Amino acid sequence: MASILRTALLGLLLFTTAQAQFQFFEQMFGGGQQHQESSGQGGNVPSDSAWYQNTYNGAQCSNYLCPGTLACVAVPHHCPCAHPKVEEKFELGEGSAICASKGGFKAGETARKIELARKGLL
């Protein structure tokens, strides 16, 4: 009787341990799809451009409205970068400017690399 009880307890212990491990793997691999589906319903901006168009059309600006940041500036090359913490603004000299990723370079390194690329040296 004691050996049957011991075998039953050991079997139950092994079953619950295996079930816990499989639930872990299900969450890691199969459960991720359920998480993605449920997170798609909460507060995400729709993939169409209607929100941007409405905001752009509703903005009041007597000079130039920057398309990337919706900032109102005097001339197009004065538009700020959308992500100034990670982008560096570089004026091209022809009345236009670009924002390029800093990429962890030291200050001014992005501008130097852009100039080298414009000259065909990079």
Swiss-Prot record:
InterPro entries: LCL2. Residues 1-20 form the signal peptide. Keywords: Signal. GO terms for biological process: ERAD pathway. The keyword Chloroplast does not apply. Probable component of the endoplasmic reticulum-associated degradation (ERAD) pathway. Belongs to the LCL2 family. PANTHER family: LONG CHRONOLOGICAL LIFESPAN PROTEIN 2 (PTHR38425:SF1). This is Long chronological lifespan protein 2. It comes from Arthroderma gypseum (strain ATCC MYA-4604 / CBS 118893) (Microsporum gypseum).
